[in-house]
Amino acid sequence: MSSAVLVTLLPDPSSSFREDAPRPPVPGEEGETPPCQPSVGKVQSTKPMPVSSNARRNEDGLGEPEGRASPDSPLTRWTKSLHSLLGDQDGAYLFRTFLEREKCVDTLDFWFACNGFRQMNLKDTKTLRVAKAIYKRYIENNSVVSKQLKPATKTYIRDGIKKQQIGSVMFDQAQTEIQAVMEENAYQVFLTSDIYLEYVRSGGENTAYMSNGGLGSLKVLCGYLPTLNEEEEWTCADLKCKLSPTVVGLSSKTLRATASVRSTETAENGFRSFKRSDPVNPYHVGSGYVFAPATSANDSELSSDALTDDSMSMTDSSVDGVPPYRMGSKKQLQREMHRSVKANGQVSLPHFPRTHRLPKEMTPVEPAAFAAELISRLEKLKLELESRHSLEERLQQIREDEEKEGSEQALSSRDGAPVQHPLALLPSGSYEEDPQTILDDHLSRVLKTPGCQSPGVGRYSPRSRSPDHHHQHHHHQQCHTLLPTGGKLPPVAACPLLGGKSFLTKQTTKHVHHHYIHHHAVPKTKEEIEAEATQRVRCLCPGGTDYYCYSKCKSHPKAPEPLPGEQFCGSRGGTLPKRNAKGTEPGLALSARDGGMSSAAGAPQLPGEEGDRSQDVWQWMLESERQSKSKPHSAQSIRKSYPLESACAAPGERVSRHHLLGASGHSRSVARAHPFTQDPAMPPLTPPNTLAQLEEACRRLAEVSKPQKQRCCVASQQRDRNHSAAGQAGASPFANPSLAPEDHKEPKKLASVHALQASELVVTYFFCGEEIPYRRMLKAQSLTLGHFKEQLSKKGNYRYYFKKASDEFACGAVFEEIWDDETVLPMYEGRILGKVERID
C-alpha cells in the first residue's frame, strides 16, 4: 500500500493517550484551533485554521500538547490582518504568487513601492526619479492600480511631481486606498484559495517549493483519483510527484502537526459523511450525483423475505462471533436494522463520472451525404431569397406606376383643355365648410318652408356643366339663360359633361381628393353651396340620359349657345317614356331621346387607354340592371331608401355613390338598383351611424304636418299628370315650379320610414302562456337563439318556438322549435314571432 493511501488511514495521534505524554492544558487555554469534529454539517472548510509546524513550550516550561498549533504561529498571524501577512516573508511571497494567478500583482508591488519610497531620503537625487517612476508605472497609465485610485488622489500626486514638491507621504493616500481594496477583495479570497490551503496542509515545514515556485504542485494526498478524460491515459506521474522528496514526508512530527487538518479532510472527503451542500466538479454535473436513503437498500434486501449472507450486515458486531442459534427471530433482525438506519442516517452514493458525448447534431456523417444536405438547404434558401426579391420588385413597380399615374392626372387636371373632370358636381369651395353641416341646415329650412324654392335655384336646375378650373379665370361672367319656346334638346356633343357621362374608372376615382382640394380654390357663396347640396340630395346627375337643362350658372366661355328651337325638359318630361329605353343600347336610347339629332356613332368616346376598363364597368352595370329587373321588390325598397342615405351618408360616400350610378339620373326614375347592394362582388361601404339616422328621421318626421302631407299627395298627382303629358307631347316646361319642394318631400318621408323599419328588427314573443305578448325593437338585421336568450329577463329552462312560413298546412305557417344557440331565428312577415314555454 502506497504512502498516499496510508495518510488517510492513520489515526489521530492527539486522540490517543500515552503515559509519557505531557499534561493537557488548562480548560479554556487549549489554543485557537479546536479539535475538528468529523460530523456532517459542522465542518467549516471556508477558513480552516492554520496549524503550526513548530510546537514550542510556554515560558513556564509546560508547553502545549503535541499536534496543537501555537497561538502566535505565522499561519495564525496571517489570518489576523493583511499587515501580518505582508509582514512575513513567506506570507508576502505566497500572497504575491496568488495575485500573479489572479493577474493583479501590481497592487502588491505598488504597496511595497510606497513603503520603500517612504524610507528614502528626500535630499537624495534618486528620490525624484523613483517618484516619477512609480507615477508612470502604476498611476499614469490605465493599470489596475490607476483604476482603483480616486481621481483626487491621482491629481494630487501628478501636481506634486510636476511642481517637484516631493514628500515622503505623497503616496500614503494612494497606498491606503490600495490596501483597503486588497483587504476587501484579494485578501479574503486568498484565505480560501488552494494555494493557502495547500500551504496549511503541508504545515509550512518544507520551504523548498518556495524557492522553486512549486506552490501549484502541492495536491491533496488522499481522496479520489483526478478525473480522467475519455481520450487520455492515466499515468502515475502525479503520484510520483507527490512522493518526491520535495513533498512533505510522513515523519512523526509532520503527522502530529497536521492531525487536525487531516481529520477535517477525512470528514470532508469521506464516504459516509459526504456534505450535500458542497459543489460538484463541473465535469460531473448532471451525472447522477444523488443520495439514496439507507432504508432503500435494507428494505430491498428484505423484500423477498430471504435471509441470505448478502442481507446481513458483516461490518458491525451484530453477527460477529454469535452462534446461529442465538441470532434471534426475524423481527429482532428487522428491529436492529431499523435502529441502525436511524443511527447512520442517509448513505451518500458515490457518483460515477460519465464520459463526454458529442451532441446528436455533431455526429460525423459521410462527406457526400453532408454535401447533399447542405446543397438542398442552400437551394431552398436561395429560392426564398429570390421570391422575396421578386415580390419587392413587383411592389416597387406598382408604387411607381401609381405615382406616375397620379402625376399624369394632376398635369391633365391643370391644363386648359375643355375636358370635364368626372367629379365636376362637387363644389370647388366645399372644403371651406363641412358639406354635411350645410346640407343639414338647408334641409331644415326647406322642410320648414315647403312651399318656397331654394334661394336662387330653380326646381330642376343642376349646377354648371363647365369645368371648375375655368371658374378661376371667368368667375365674373354669368349668363342667365331663358326658357326657349320650343325645339329639341341640343346635340350630345354640345354638352361636355354629357359626353363624360360614361364611366368612372379607378384612375378617376383615385384622384378625387387631390383635384378638388388642391386645384379649386375659388370660394363660393353659401347660397350656391346649398343649391348644389340640394341637387345632390335629389340625385340629379348632370350628364344623365333623362335630364338636361340649363340654369343660372357660370358658363363655360367656349360652350356653344343653345339653339333657338331648343327647349328644356323636366324630371318627368323626357322625350320618351322610361319604358321605351328598356331593352335598347345606351347609344340608341340616347339618340331616341335627342329626337334623331345624334346617332350612336356620335356618342362620346373614352380615351383609348381606358376603353377596356370602362367597358368592363359598363358590362357590370348592365348586369346589375338585369338583376334588378328580376327583383322588383328589392329594387323598389332600395330606391326608396336611397334619398335618406344620400342625406345622411358621409360626403365621400355620397360622391362615390353618385358617380358610380353614372348616367342613371334621378334615383326615382332609375330601373337599375344601386350596384353596391346588388352586386356581392363589390366591397361593402362603411355603414352609416344608425343612431344618427334614426334621430334625423324622427326630427324630420316631426316637422312634417298633415296639411303638408295632403299637398304632397296633390303634388304627386300633378306630377303624374305632367309626366303623362310629357310622354305624349315629347317635351314640356315645368307645370308648377312652386310644387317642387313638396314633390321632393314625399319620397324623402317614405324613404325615411322605410329606412327606419329596415334598420330595426321587431321581435314579438309570448312568455309561458301569458295572453299579452312582449314586443321589442332590436337594431340588427338577424337574430340568433343565443342573442334571443340574452334579451329574456328571466333565466331558466325553456323551450323556444318561432313562427315561420310553411306549405305543409292550410294556415301557411308553423311554429318550429329551435334549440341551437347559433341558429338564426326565422322571420314571419318581416318580424320574429316566438313562444317561450317552461320545461316541466
From Swiss-Prot:
Q: Which GO terms describe its biological process?
A: aortic valve morphogenesis; bone mineralization; canonical Wnt signaling pathway; cell population proliferation; cellular response to dexamethasone stimulus; chondrocyte differentiation involved in endochondral bone morphogenesis; dorsal/ventral axis specification; intramembranous ossification
Glycosyltransferase keyword on record? no
- Report the SS bond pairs: none
Task: State the residue spans of region: Disordered.
Answer: 1-75, 300-363, 398-435, 447-485, 572-614, 715-745
Kindly state the tissue distribution recorded for this protein: Expressed in Tcf7-positive innate-like T-cells (at protein level).
Q: What sequence ranges are listed for the domain RGS?
A: 81-200
Where is this chain's protein located in or outside the cell? Cytoplasm
Query: Where is this chain compositionally biased, Low complexity type?
Result: 303-318
Q: What residue intervals hold the motif Tankyrase-binding motif?
A: 21-30
Q: Where is this region: Interaction with beta-catenin?
A: 413-478
Q: Name one Pfam family in it.
A: DIX
* Region (Interaction with GSK3B) residue spans: 327-413
Spell out the protein name for this chain.
Answer: Axin-2
Per the UniProt record, the source organism is Mus musculus
